[in-house]
Amino acid sequence: MSTFGAEVDQVWPAVTGDSPHLTNFGRKLLKDCRQVQKPIGGYENLGNVIKLSAEFPLEFGVNSVKVYRQSPSRLARINEEVASAYPLIHERTLGLYLQYLEHKCRWGNAVEKPIYRNLSLCGFVQRLLVKRCASFFARNDKYLLVSGESGASGFEAVGTREEKAPLVLANVLSYDDIKLSALLSVSSRTEFVNEGERTNCGHVDLNTKTLERHGVIVGMIGARLSRRNLMEFQDIVIARQQNTRERGYGMALDEPATTRDEDYRRLWREFYATRDLIHGQAVIDNQRFGPSKNKMDVFDNLVMKRRYAISFDMLLLEAEARAKRVKKLAYIHVVGFGLGVWKAAEQQERIFMETFEQRMRTLGNRLNNVGLVHFSWFSITHCGGLSNGSLIEIPGHPKDGIRVLISKRNPARKLSDPEHAGMLLVVSYAWDGNALPGNEFWMKMLQSTGDSSTACSTLVAELHNPYINTKFCNGGNLHIASPEHGVLHIAEYAKRVIRSESDAL
């Protein structure tokens, strides 16, 4: 039983039968995805990346992570790593994206409708990839655009008549977009330049006895709860000025919307499969409703758990798919994405770990190639069935279950223990929904976050960059993580969900 009671302890999402409910609008967009061509890798991958990297308008934080600076002995493998990159979303997020596009086409203002009305699903994902800033951080939204323009604040007006250049919807993401972008990951194989410690600054480590030379890298984005009335704060924190009927809160799950605000809240109620509340309806009970750092707010532990569940499913299913392709067991390095400066409640770390354990058990026999999950830099050392060295037992698993470690480790430290030899290292890192991989890296702030230190220790600054790895890190290469179907390219997923060409629109 969860620390937070039976309601929070419910298993969600379901493993089967949870494919998105499609309106006529969404069905048409998903049907169109069946024609999307998955890009094919070739010998020219490397040359294209090197050429486009040289043309990229911003200076890199360090050059040691560029493909052209890698050892010639690594280049054949890097050519394959370039082609291994793709954007990834959970299948519930796919349904949300389709509903969001329909919402903007119906309820959007004069600024929004011209942007969204002609977008395909893959076109929308491409927008989320290429319209983001290079850097975007701090409470005042300090930013650096790919164009080189920089400043702070102004994003709340994007997509309204009050927007001002350069922060206009045609060129950048609105806060509504960023909230959806936070549910998008990019994954690839990569070389590791060093162990990835926070202060690595791109130094080249040639010691193969301490460094895992290559593995998988996945950018994961936590809930940004540090900005009131924006992002996931809208769903997870119940606040007096935010949670009002006028803003669309408090409606039943199936209640039809009659205003733009009501329809926007409908999207998120359906995504999280729970109603939202008006401030005053929720009383702190340390079960579903917990305290928040702001004593006037109430923290919804259930919705926080569901936000985590979507991310954890993605990471676990992606690690499984990557490991299965190479016939290995995955060693997953997990960091507490969203548990730093974005955190709004002390109980979040415990919710994080309880949810991760439940998703491992729930996905269970779909994770036969996941061998170990290593929680790194967590303050909690015991949580439910999770402790250093514990085994999450899974009937039929080739290793009887998934081993758990909880200790501090550098992301790319050598898997030197005999029982870990031959495993595939899958590293998660805390990314941002409105920044290129590395974020502060592009402002030469190399030691500020795990995001920038990851860009200094892997090839993500090029491989996960939609301006540089244009063929593979793009919306047309979208992959869907489905608990029922595994990880599939969007075209294959669409064909499975929409069974035949003759299905009615």
Swiss-Prot record:
Q: What is its EC number?
A: 3.2.2.19
* Catalyzed reactions: N(omega)-(ADP-D-ribosyl)-L-arginyl-[protein] + H2O = ADP-D-ribose + L-arginyl-[protein]; N(omega)-(ADP-D-ribosyl)-L-arginine + H2O = ADP-D-ribose + L-arginine
Q: What does this protein do?
A: Protein ADP-ribosyl hydrolase that specifically removes mono-ADP-ribosyl modifications from protein arginine residues.
Q: Which residues bind ADP-D-ribose?
A: 198, 336, 338, 340-342, 377, 432, 439-440, 450-451
- Name of the protein this chain belongs to: ADP-ribosylarginine hydrolase CG2909
Is Membrane a UniProt keyword of this protein? no
Pfam families noted in UniProt: MavL-like
Query: What organism does this protein naturally occur in?
Result: Drosophila melanogaster (Fruit fly)
**Taxonomy, superkingdom:** Eukaryota
What's its top-level EC category? hydrolase
The UniProt entry, under InterPro entries, shows: MavL-like
Q: Which UniProt keywords apply?
A: Hydrolase
Q: Does the keyword Transmembrane apply?
A: no
| MF terms in GO | ADP-ribosylarginine hydrolase activity
